[in-house]
Amino acid sequence: MTTRLTAWGVTGIGEIKPDDQLGDIIVAACRNEPNGPLLDGDVLVVTQKVVSKAEGQLVAIDPTNPLSHKQLVEDEAVRIVRRRGDLIITETKHGFVCANSGVDLSNVERGQAALLPKDSDRSARRIRDIVRAQLGVEVGVIVSDTFGRAWRKGLTDVAIGVAGIAAVVDLRGTADALGRVMQVTEVAIADELASAAELVMGKSSGIPVAVVRGADPGWFREASVSELVRPPQEDLFR
């Protein structure tokens, strides 16, 4: 475990457009960071929106017709979980259960909607590989997005893609502070790091990338965000 984490938003990213080389842009911004260069063991958290923009995951919708957005949400879903008014909870092609299939109208031009990246693990790996090649450091990369929670109000950022950092840290079989063996404890470490990073990025500050420093060395490994998706046979509410 770690007893100290520090996090800061990376400034100077600017507006991202389709076909921009996001990894190169992030590296350039990190070179100019007043907090100093990236170090081995840092974690880069990158918001889904800039990843989707760079990868061209933008589609045109009719902003005057609510049915246009609704149809797009349904097209991006493999299953409709719940409906209430304009809100639709869906399961996406990635296995995520979230509002509106992750289709987002915020921070994009009117008449556009941003879709989730096709493969956010791959997106994270690309950024990680560019950082490694250009800066010579080994970092973890998390692609984050904002999700609601079924049983609690409010939004929080979670991981939808990872590279070089665990999605889940399995503590089953280890002892707690009183020596009892833990039977079910699996920590969603990538989600926790994504949430920590969101505190220094915000929703409207124009800072889409953050660095988290101080992660436990044991968290770094090759992984996939699919580790966070609960299998249907284990889901009590499906």
Role assignments for model-derived ranges:
Residues 20-36, 118-135:
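Phosphate-interacting basic helix/loop segments used at nucleotide- and nucleic-acid interfaces
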Residues 2-14, 48, 58-111, 115, ...:
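A structural signal for small-residue-enriched, beta-sheet-centric alpha/beta enzyme cores
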Residues 2-62:
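N-terminal, positively charged regions that mediate nucleic acid binding
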